[in-house]
């Protein structure tokens, strides 16, 4: 069982990595003049972990889910006028595809992205989907780079793998 100091240190290091990644991702998205830098910020936070392998896995899940959700949203928008039931259908299809393709960890993200694309007021959905994907890739990329920085203090003997339960 871990001591309180170890748990606090783990939490601090994870918080520091997430904050740093989110800040850098947001600043880069603004520098690239992406329309919604907050998506880069969120992506960096959501995939950040103390273990590089886990950050990679979370990033791949998030990236696949974003792509699936964006594709579902765009394809549905192209086929049917977006209405409440179409948005629900997009969420259902995007999440189901994630489960079938073994990306269950990203299913909710796929549903969210599909809905956001279908609700892309004032923008063409292809453009909106492209920006969401770009912002997500940026955030995940920053998180992946930060995961390569060694931890401040090693907490276990295998720093590149999460503990097994």
Regions found by a protein language model. Give the residues of each.
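Alpha-helical transmembrane segments and their membrane-interface boundaries
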Residues: 1-165
């Amino acid at each position: 069982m871990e001591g309180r100091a170890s748990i606090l240190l783990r939490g601090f290091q994870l918080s520091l990595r997430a904050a740093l990644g989110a800040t850098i991702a947001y600043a880069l998205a603004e520098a690239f003049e992406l329309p919604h830098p907050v998506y880069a910020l969120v992506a960096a936070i959501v995939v950040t972990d103390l273990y590089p392998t886990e950050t990679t896995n979370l990033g791949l899940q998030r990236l696949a889910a974003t792509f699936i959700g964006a594709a579902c949203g765009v394809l549905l928008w192209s086929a049917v006028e977006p209405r409440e039931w179409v948005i629900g259908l997009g969420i259902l299809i995007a999440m189901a595809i994630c489960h079938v393709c073994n990306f269950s960890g990203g299913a909710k993200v796929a549903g969210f992205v599909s809905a956001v694309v279908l609700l892309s007021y004032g923008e063409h959905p292809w453009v909106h989907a492209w920006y969401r994907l770009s912002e997500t890739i940026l955030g995940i990329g920053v998180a992946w780079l930060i995961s390569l920085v060694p931890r401040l203090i090693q907490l276990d003997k295998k720093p590149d793998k999460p503990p097994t339960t």
